[in-house]
Amino acid sequence: MASHRLLLLCLAGLVFVSEAGPTGAGESKCPLMVKVLDAVRGSPAVNVAVNVFKRAADETWEPFASGKTSESGELHGLTTEEEFVEGIYKVEIDTKSYWKALGISPFHEHAEVVFAANDSGPRRYTIAALLSPYSYSTTAVVTNPKE
């Protein structure tokens, strides 16, 4: 249990450090960013498919955005401030395809994070996931947009 807490603390620290400054042009205005790290290799998880869904009034999940992580393990540009309105969102990270591409048979099909967004006004959300073949850990950093 203590090692799990330490792992979560390290993941949160990694996300915090990565949020210290923008990593590219125009990314500071990105209201939703996903970062995926490979705990086995100690590196960014590259080319991981990410799907984002928004909960509809009838409680079903509607596709909202999708993409793949970059060489830095990050996915920016999923949405705009205008499109990312108040609501319940689900980020689904395709862990199975990632591990299969590396020749590893994983336990999980995907990792998912369901969260309420912008219920207290506009915010910036960074969802981070630390992956291994038989476990995953997620954390989020939520900040106010800079004026």
Swiss-Prot record:
Subcellular location: Secreted
Role summary: Thyroid hormone-binding protein. Probably transports thyroxine from the bloodstream to the brain.
Disulfide bonds: none
GO cellular component: extracellular space
Residue positions with a glycan: 118
Principal location: secreted
Residue numbers carrying Phosphoserine: 72
Signal peptide: 1-20
Protein name: Transthyretin
Family affiliation: Belongs to the transthyretin family.
Domain of life: Eukaryota
Keywords for this protein: Gamma-carboxyglutamic acid, Glycoprotein, Hormone, Phosphoprotein, Secreted, Signal, Sulfation, Thyroid hormone, Transport
Gene Ontology MF, one: hormone activity
Alphabetical list of SUPFAM superfamilies matching this protein: Transthyretin (synonym: prealbumin)
Keyword Ribosomal protein among UniProt keywords: no
Tissue: Detected in liver.
Modified residue annotations for 4-carboxyglutamate: 62
Source taxonomy: Eukaryota, Metazoa, Chordata, Craniata, Vertebrata
Post-translational events: Sulfonation of the reactive cysteine Cys-30 enhances the stability of the native conformation of TTR, avoiding misassembly of the protein leading to amyloid formation.
Subunit: Homotetramer. Dimer of dimers. In the homotetramer, subunits assemble around a central channel that can accommodate two ligand molecules. Interacts with RBP4.
Gene Ontology annotations of biological process type: purine nucleobase metabolic process
Binding site for L-thyroxine: 35, 74, 137
Modified residues (Sulfocysteine): 30
InterPro entries, alphabetized: Thyroxine_BS, Transthyretin/HIU_hydrolase, Transthyretin/HIU_hydrolase_d, Transthyretin/HIU_hydrolase_sf, Transthyretin_CS
Pfam annotation, one family: Transthyretin
